[in-house]
């Protein structure tokens, strides 16, 4: 936890909902970091089909998920607005367009009128009315979904890249960075370099650079369990 100071600021007032598998490094690191900072952690019922009930009961300030679930949230909100149709549906999409334009122009999607009239209700229905930080990892997320969540939920959306061997994030986006198509800067606890792979045509001198991503630092694991037995196994 002491090496993960690059993670977003988390205070003892924060509330995190833990529902992703703890066998995966992403949730394990986030949960332990929250406890390390004195934040509260609530656990879901064990049924992902009831996650909405859990969110409404806990009202977390931090929400950590993967693109698949974020896509479902996006589809649920947009689908609900389309199903309403009429004036309510038109007003929703007008408000959404206005907030997206403001996000791209200023870096903030806040709009007092539309937030009060429309999006505050959406957030309460999802149990995310207190959510200030949304973290995403494990796979790329579409830029339009990310921007939608920024304006609909009104939270910082922070994406990262890493793996089990790097204790989750090896790179992480700055909380105030609203640009897309990247996974941020190297985490403070590690160094990254691109290693040329000539047989695959990867070169760090190319434009744009490419290569095998190599990571070193205190967040990198020491080795695999029973290394002497498994050293001849294929590595990812």
Task: Give the role of each language-model region.
Residues 19-24, 138-140:
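Conserved AMP-binding
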Residues 15-17, 214:
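Short, well-ordered beta-strand segments
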Residues 114-236:
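Conserved AMP-binding/adenylate-forming
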Residues 1-15, 22-116, 152:
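Conserved AMP-binding/adenylation subdomain of ANL enzymes
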């Amino acid at each position: 936890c002491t090496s993960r100071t690059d993670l977003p600021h988390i205070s003892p007032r924060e509330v995190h909902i833990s529902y992703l598998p703890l066998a995966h490094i992403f949730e394990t690191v986030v949960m332990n970091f929250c406890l390390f900072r004195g934040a509260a952690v609530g656990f879901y019922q064990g049924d992902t089909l009831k996650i909405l009930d859990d969110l409404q009961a806990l009202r977390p300030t931090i929400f950590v998920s993967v693109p698949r679930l974020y896509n479902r949230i996006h589809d649920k909100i947009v689908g609900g607005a389309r199903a309403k149709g009429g004036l309510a549906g038109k007003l929703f999409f007008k408000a959404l367009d206005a907030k997206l334009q403001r996000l791209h122009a200023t870096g903030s999607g806040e709009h007092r009128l539309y937030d009060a009239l429309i999006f505050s209700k959406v957030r309460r229905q999802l149990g995310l009315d207190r959510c200030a930080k949304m973290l995403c990892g494990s796979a790329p997320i579409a830029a339009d979904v990310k921007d939608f969540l920024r304006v609909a939920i009104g939270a910082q959306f922070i994406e990262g890249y890493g793996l089990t061997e790097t204790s989750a994030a090896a790179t992480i986006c700055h909380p105030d960075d609203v640009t897309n198509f990247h996974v941020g800067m190297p985490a403070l606890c590690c160094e990254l370099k691109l290693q040329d792979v000539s047989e695959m045509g990867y070169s760090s001198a190319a434009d744009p650079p490419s290569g095998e991503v190599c990571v070193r630092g205190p967040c990198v694991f020491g080795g695999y369990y029973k290394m002497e037995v498994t050293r001849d196994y294929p590595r990812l």
